[in-house]
A protein has these predicted regions:
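Compositionally biased terminal segments of proteins
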Residues: 1-267
Length: 267
């Protein structure tokens, strides 16, 4: 489980990014581990996130160099084309922690950037289906202490329950990261429990007409999640139990996620 000292440092960096990139508010969506935190925190004691994942709309990729320079000027070190890191002081204990920032974009957007520079990022940061985050999101206020002190606040568009599950399913399919399984488990607590979460998911699904491509992607993500959480002996429940340091037992995790999946309309 991530320590509050580290996640509050990440939230501090998140606030700074939101203020610095405010002009791009409508063209970027917060996804990754912070989205499940903001979605579930009223119903589940989510630990927060260390990494920051921002989905960029394809149309602003021609301006990526300007965005990159803004990030570097904040003190981030560019590790790869879409990945940055920075040492941030935590407002909790005053210690320094390394925070990572990833920009995500669809394959169509990658054409605006020299492909020779993003080979290492292709699977991690460039994939189709990310436009779901722009169809399914909500606005969230972030208020905390900026790096270097001083309270402030800003707003982000945040991937909602449907788009977060879609992207988390994709993540589970491509890597073995315990935090992704934990985030999925957290999302099934939305509105009070798995049945309530599934009702909200179904409502989101009814309110919009998904494209054939996005329907296929969402179905695939949900099938991956089902396979990973099918029984308490599958990797998903093990990952949640391990990440939570045995706070959530495998049988409880498998049952909770199973109830959620059994009650959603899209199969």
């Amino acid at each position: 489980m991530y320590a509050k000292e580290v996640t509050e440092a990440s939230k501090s960096a998140l606030l700074e990014l939101g203020l610095s990139l405010k002009r791009h508010h409508e063209d970027m969506v917060l996804a990754g581990g912070w989205a499940p935190y903001f979605i579930s925190r009223e119903y589940f004691p989510h630990c927060g996130s260390i990494d920051i994942d921002l989905v960029l709309k394809t149309k602003i990729l021609p301006k990526y160099e300007s965005i990159r320079k803004t990030i570097v000027n904040l003190g981030y070190v560019q590790e790869r084309q879409f990945r940055f890191s920075r040492i941030v002081r935590s407002p909790v204990d005053g210690k320094d922690y390394e925070i990572h920032l990833d920009f995500l974009c669809e394959k169509e957007g990658a054409k605006y950037i020299d492909l020779r520079k993003i080979q290492e990022d292709l699977h991690a940061c460039v994939f189709d289906g990310l436009n779901l985050a722009f169809e399914f999101n909500f606005e969230q206020e972030v208020e905390t202490v900026l790096p270097g002190n001083g309270e402030d606040k800003t707003k982000f568009l945040v991937a909602n329950l449907l788009s977060s599950l879609a992207l988390k399913g994709q993540a589970l399919n491509g890597r073995a990261k315990q935090k992704d399984a934990y985030d999925i488990f957290a999302l099934t607590h939305y509105k009070g429990g798995p049945k309530e979460a599934s009702e909200n998911f179904n409502k989101l699904l009814k309110d919009k007409n998904l494209s054939v491509e996005n329907t296929k992607m969402l179905k695939h993500s949900l099938s991956v999640i089902r396979e990973k959480f099918l029984t308490e002996n599958k990797s998903g429940p093990f990952a949640v139990e391990n990440f939570s340091e045995n706070r959530y037992k495998r049988n409880v995790v498998a049952e909770q996620v199973g109830i959620f999946l059994d009650n959603i309309l899209l199969q």
